[in-house]
A protein has these predicted regions:
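Alpha-helical transmembrane segments and adjacent TM-loop junctions that form the membrane-embedded core
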Residues: 1-91
Length: 91
């Protein structure tokens, strides 16, 4: 059966939070949006990352996280991870 299993939004948020928090470059999860698009759940995450990361690194990390989330939650139609460099410096 190709029926998409129903996963509660709470469970999605929990799993996504875990995946994002495990990544060393993620500073803070700013937004987690779960919407339905053409009957597919669509997830958008906005996270702050270290300001020292290059744009290329941000893209690589975002793709990596999107893949991880898609693997963990097969029922999601689309996963988008947006990384925003955080202005705060550590020093």
């Amino acid at each position: 059966g190709a029926i998409a299993e129903q996963v509660s939004p709470e469970e999605v948020r929990l799993k996504v939070n875990l995946i994002l928090q495990q990544h060393r470059n993620i500073r803070k999860i700013l937004k987690l949006d779960l919407t339905r698009e053409a009957n597919f759940p669509t997830l958008t995450c906005v996270c702050s990352v270290d300001a020292s990361l290059t744009i290329r690194e941000c893209h690589q990390i975002a793709s990596q996280l999107e893949n991880q989330i898609e693997k963990a939650l097969h029922h999601l139609g689309r996963v988008t991870v947006i990384l925003k460099p955080s202005k705060q410096n550590r020093n």
